[in-house]
Curated annotation (Swiss-Prot):
Function field: May play a role in DNA repair. It seems to be involved in an RecBC-independent recombinational process of DNA repair. It may act with RecF and RecO.
Domain Toprim: 83-182
UniProt protein name: Recombination protein RecR
PANTHER family attached to this UniProt entry: RECOMBINATION PROTEIN RECR
Cleavable signal peptide: none
UniProt record similarity statement: Belongs to the RecR family.
Keyword Metal-binding among UniProt keywords: yes
C4-type ZnF: 58-75
GO-annotated molecular function: DNA binding; zinc ion binding
Gene name linked to the record: recR
InterPro entries (alphabetical): DNA_Rcmb_RecR, Rcmb_RecR, TOPRIM_dom, TOPRIM_RecR
A Pfam entry, by short name: RecR_C
Gene Ontology biological-process annotations: DNA recombination; DNA repair
Length: 205
C-alpha cells in the first residue's frame, strides 16, 4: 500500500534502503518523524548531513573519526599498546572489541574483505595502508604483533590468508583470534565475553 502523500512515500522508500529495515519498519519510522516537532526532524537532518561532511577515516588506522580529530582518539592515546595492531573489517568491529574493555592495543580497519565473487580484490580494501604503516621505521614503539580479527566467513579466511602472506617479510608475529565464534557470524553481534575469550586465546598462524 502506498501513501497518498508523495513526501511520506519517498521517506519510507529511503528508510527501507537502510540495512535491516523492511517496509513496515520504514513506515513506523516515517510516521514517527511525521508526528515529531519540526525541530526534531531538523536535528535528524542535521546529524545526517554532519556524518557526511565531518566524518573521515583516521590517517593512521582508517577507523572513522571527526575531521578535527585526526588521528583518532585511540591512535592518539598514550595509554594504548602500540606494539599490537588488531586488524578488523569495519568500524563496528572496533566498537565491539572496545566494549569488552579487554583489548588495549591499536587497530587497523580494512573497510571490507577480499571477495572475488563480488569483484572485491585486495586493492579495494585498506591492506596497502596497513603495509605502509608497518613499514614506517620512525615509530617510537615498533609493531611486534598483528592480530587478525576478521569474521569467520569464506571472505574473512581468504583475507586473513592473503594478509598473512604479505606480512611474512616484516618478521612480525601474526596471530588470529581463537575459534569459538560461530562460522558466518559477524563480530559486531558477538557478546563481549565471547570476544574477550577469543582475543585472549589468539594463536599464531
Amino acid at each position: 500500500m502506498r501513501y497518498t502523500s508523495a513526501a511520506i512515500e519517498t521517506l519510507i522508500e529511503e528508510f527501507a534502503k537502510l540495512p535491516g529495515i523492511g517496509r513496515k519498519t520504514a513506515q513506523r519510522l516515517a510516521m514517527h518523524i511525521l508526528h515529531e516537532p519540526k525541530s526534531g526532524a531538523e536535528r535528524l537532518a542535521g546529524a545526517l548531513i554532519d556524518i557526511k561532511e565531518k566524518v573521515i577515516r583516521c590517517s593512521v588506522c582508517q577507523n572513522v573519526t571527526d575531521r578535527d580529530a585526526d588521528p583518532c582518539y585511540i591512535c592518539s592515546s598514550t595509554g594504548r599498546d602500540r606494539s599490537v595492531i588488531c586488524v578488523v573489517e569495519s568500524p563496528a568491529d572496533v566498537l565491539a572489541f572496545e566494549k569488552t574493555g579487554h583489548y588495549k592495543g591499536q587497530y587497523h580497519v580494512l573497510h571490507g574483505l577480499v571477495s572475488p565473487l563480488d569483484g572485491i580484490g585486495p586493492d579495494d580494501i585498506r591492506i596497502h595502508e596497513l603495509l605502509a604503516r608497518l613499514g614506517e621505521r620512525h615509530e617510537a614503539v615498533p609493531v611486534k604483533e598483528v592480530v587478525l580479527a576478521l569474521n569467520p566467513t569464506v571472505e574473512g579466511e581468504t583475507t586473513s590468508l592473503y594478509i598473512t602472506r604479505l606480512l611474512k617479510p616484516f618478521g612480525i608475529s601474526v596471530t588470529k583470534i581463537a575459534r569459538g565464534i560461530p562460522v558466518g557470524a559477524e563480530l559486531e553481534f558477538i557478546d563481549e565475553a565471547t570476544l574477550s575469550r577469543a582475543m585472549e586465546g589468539r594463536s599464531a598462524v
